[in-house]
Amino acid sequence: MAGENTSRRTGSARLDEVIPEFELVSTDVKILAEKYLQDERIYRIWFEYLIPDEIDLIFPTTDGKLNYLSFTKRLASAIRYGRIKTAVSNNSSSNSYGSTEHVCDHGTSLCGRSERFASVINRFLDLHQILKDC
């Protein structure tokens, strides 16, 4: 029985080879599933390579591509949630680059907590330095 499954898997085709191209592009997934996945046949899975050639040229390594995706995700988040360069207003704080960031209440709370955490760590480091010098 295990031999049957192995032979079925090695002899199986990919769905993109079975389904005609025009039907794959134009037909709904539910209709395709009803039409092609009714039998007990096992199909191989394929993944399309979706990264544009320009990205491959600029970032040839996987690590570079992941760093790029991470940066653009953070940039999109910053733009969406109001961290954009604007004129100085009452509800904004200036960062080290001279632009302004509109900070929501959650951001203000996190900044306060991180400042308190940094001050506690600095006190521990000062104490460590004093004890080390003794």
From Swiss-Prot:
Localization recorded for this chain is: Host nucleus
Q: Name one GO cellular component term.
A: host cell nucleus
Keywords per UniProt:
Host nucleus, Viral genome packaging, Viral release from host cell
On the tree of life, the source organism's domain of life is Viruses
Q: Could you tell me the Gene Ontology terms of the biological process aspect for this record?
A: viral DNA genome packaging
Name the major location: host cell
Q: Name one Pfam family in it.
A: Herpes_UL33
Q: Give the matching InterPro entries.
A: Herpes_TT2
What family does the database annotate? Belongs to the herpesviridae TRM2 protein family.
Oligomeric state and interaction partners are given as: Associates with TRM1 and TRM3 to form the tripartite terminase complex.
Function per UniProt: Component of the molecular motor that translocates viral genomic DNA in empty capsid during DNA packaging. Forms a tripartite terminase complex together with TRM1 and TRM3 in the host cytoplasm. Once the complex reaches the host nucleus, it interacts with the capsid portal vertex. This portal forms a ring in which genomic DNA is translocated into the capsid.
- Quote the protein name from its UniProt record: Tripartite terminase subunit 2
